[in-house]
């Protein structure tokens, strides 16, 4: 089974993926790691970490789709998590493989923007946290 966990930035996708790993033993990978492979390994592809999340999703989708299709074909149990799975992009993959793909989208509805920025700053671990040193307006545009 291929599990895809997507949603807005800072909604807890990585936390859920890690907990799922601990409970099931099914490994996960963050699409952020794949995107940084493009950023630092093959910058000529134009996929980099300074694009807006929707731009990254559109540009990286052909690669992710091919990777997902191969994992499904090989019957690999795996979790992929990240913002780069937009509903309109993933629909075909899900429709073609309803018994082999599970998708969940995460977000937050009970928080206003100012509260969420405070939460981002207050609950940052600092480890791998790409928003920790960014100004409030940049954080607001990504959450």
Regions found by a protein language model. Name each.
Residues 15-18, 22-63:
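Conserved substrate/cofactor phosphate-moiety recognition/catalytic segment
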Residues 33-35, 85-86, 108-113:
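Conserved nucleotide-binding/hydrolysis micro-motifs of P-loop NTPases
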Residues 2:
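Walker A (P-loop) ATP-phosphate-binding motif of ABC ATPase nucleotide-binding domains
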Residues 8-9:
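The conserved Walker
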Residues 55-107:
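Glycine-rich phosphate-binding loop used to anchor ATP phosphates in small-molecule kinases
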Residues 5:
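Hydrophobic anchor at the beta1->P-loop junction of P-loop NTPases
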Residues 12:
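Conserved glycine(s) of the Walker
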Residues 99-143:
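A glycine- and Lys/Arg-enriched "phosphate-lid" helix/loop adjacent to the NTP-binding pocket
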